[in-house]
């Protein structure tokens, strides 16, 4: 029942899963530009991490405020999982295609609006913040080869920054 941006919604999810799940589970709490205090009060013995959408996505779950991002990376006592797309680049690309082709854009413009440049710029920012604040970061759903250059080689148990891809994106 997304978005899970409050401890109350998170408790509802845990309660529901306790009644219905046949597998081990945990949940992320979702950050927004204005719920950082709430996010930081979560019980991180139960919550697997903080989910951050750095590009607009579901409801109000965008976190594009530099102050909010810095606070999350500086104060998070747990893993930060980011969906990385640079909002300013997305907006500029969308405006460009709307100006050229009108408001009813075809789905073929999706990868042009949410471009490789938008992904790399945002992933770079997340990695820089993780290094600056010594935060544990997981980059969700990498979509460009260039983003791999942001990651270091070595055993996973020694990594501060990890990532994954979705097979259907390859």
What are these model-derived regions, one by one?
Residues 1, 56-57:
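A short, flexible beta-alpha/helix-coil linker loop
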Residues 1-20:
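Metal-associated gating/positioning segment near the N- to mid-region
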Residues 15, 19-22, 59, 78:
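Alpha-helix capping at helix-to-loop junctions
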């Amino acid at each position: 029942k997304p978005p899970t941006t409050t401890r109350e919604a998170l408790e509802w999810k845990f309660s529901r899963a306790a009644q219905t799940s046949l597998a081990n589970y945990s949940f992320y709490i979702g950050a927004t530009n204005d719920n950082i205090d709430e996010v930081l009060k979560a019980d991180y013995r139960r919550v697997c991490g903080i989910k951050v959408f750095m590009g607009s996505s579901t409801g109000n779950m965008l976190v594009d405020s530099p102050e909010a991002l810095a606070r999350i990376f500086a104060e998070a006592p747990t893993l930060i999982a980011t969906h990385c797309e640079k909002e300013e680049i997305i907006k500029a690309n969308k405006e460009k295609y709307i100006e050229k082709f009108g408001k009813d854009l075809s789905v073929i413009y999706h990868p042009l609006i949410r471009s490789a440049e938008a992904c790399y710029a945002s992933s770079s920012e997340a990695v820089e913040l993780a290094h600056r604040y010594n935060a544990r970061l997981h980059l969700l759903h990498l979509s460009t080869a260039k983003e791999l250059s942001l990651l270091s080689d070595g055993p996973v148990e020694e990594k501060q920054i990890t990532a994954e891809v979705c097979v259907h994106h390859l």
